[in-house]
Every structure is written in structure tokens, then in C-alpha cells.
């Protein structure tokens, strides 16, 4: 007698973990904004991007799309018990500040905001300048 599909196929059911604190990684590029929420060890709890929440093309690079993506990721992470986060910002896109504001307004306590934008110490040669 099989009780449900999970027992039938031998698939483990996803357990809801209680994680009180975590790290939010916001990658704001010129084309998109990606928000990843991890536990302190680096295991991903939830993620969202402007493309995942339904925006496409040039609308993905807007600040409002970053706000919606941050709210979506925060809501999914708060369902697993997340309350306090540290924020790491990477990149120079339009959604940097608006993503942090959305995290605060969604109910997460932001303890630290760090800028982790990679800056080369004169490493690789950049692409040629765009002439429009």
C-alpha cells in the first residue's frame, strides 16, 4: 500500500530549515539584477532575478525590477525562518540601492551593507570602447 508519491519514488521531501541569519548577495549589472540569499556557510536558501520575476529585455535593468526580485527572494527566505541578513553588493547597475530598500521594507533586519564590486588591479585588457 503506497501512501503518496514521495514514498513511491523514494524522493526525499524538502525539509523547512530554521535559519535565523544569512547573507544576501546582490549582483547588479547593467542588464539584470540577481539577488541570492544564503546561510552563513554559503548554501543557497533562495534566489531571484529580474528575469525570473517576469521582466524581459530592457525592463530587466530597471530599479523597479530589482525591487520586485529582492522582495520575491526575501519572501521565500523568510518562510524558512530568516530574520537578520548581511548584504553584499556587487556591480554598478541601477538596482543596487532599490534592492537593499526592498529587503528592509520586506521585514528583514539588515545588519551590514558591504560593497564587494570587483575592481581590477590592472588585470585584463578591457573591451574596445563602444562608438554609437
UniProtKB/Swiss-Prot annotation:
Keyword annotations of the record: Ribonucleoprotein, Ribosomal protein, RNA-binding, rRNA-binding
Gene Ontology MF: a single term: rRNA binding
Listed GO CC annotations: cytosolic small ribosomal subunit
Pfam families named among the record's database cross-references: Ribosomal_S11
Alphabetized PROSITE patterns for the sequence: RIBOSOMAL_S11
UniProt record, GO biological process: translation
InterPro entries reported for this sequence: Ribosomal_uS11 (IPR001971), Ribosomal_uS11_bac-type (IPR019981), Ribosomal_uS11_CS (IPR018102), Ribosomal_uS11_sf (IPR036967)
Disulfide-bond pairs as recorded: none
Function comment: Located on the platform of the 30S subunit, it bridges several disparate RNA helices of the 16S rRNA. Forms part of the Shine-Dalgarno cleft in the 70S ribosome.
HAMAP family reported in the protein's UniProt record: Ribosomal_uS11
Family: Belongs to the universal ribosomal protein uS11 family.
Subunit structure: Part of the 30S ribosomal subunit. Interacts with proteins S7 and S18. Binds to IF-3.
Protein name: Small ribosomal subunit protein uS11
Name of the gene this protein is made from: rpsK
